[in-house]
Amino acid sequence: MAVYAIGDIQGCWREFKALLKKLRLKDSDELWLAGDLINRGPDSLKVLRKLRAMDQQVHIVLGNHDLHFLAIVFGGHNAGAKDTFAELLGADDVEDLANWLRKQKLLHRNYGHVMTHAGLPGC
């Protein structure tokens, strides 16, 4: 079993897909994702759909871009001029994806390691 930690995919589907191909994940491998899965890049929708399909193999902590998206969907916030959520917000499955995303953690701990998107006090 291998554990791979990746941060800040930021909607870059093509690059993420290429990385997954290089990793050649086995069923027993784990993918730890340190937040900012979406926004900035052009393909946030593809990234979220892929990660949701890999749900049993990935451990995700939310980053500020992910939380910003959830605030737009559930909290009445507006997307900013630089946000690249348009395709995602218009998707038929946006609520399902947002509900799945909001169940992810802010911190993941396993194998004697802790993963967050940002730092921890005292570290």
Kindly give the residue locations of the regions a language model identified.
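N-terminal active-site segment of His-dependent metallophosphoesterases
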Residues: 1-50, 54
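Active-site neighborhood of divalent metal-dependent phosphoester bond hydrolases
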Residues: 45-123
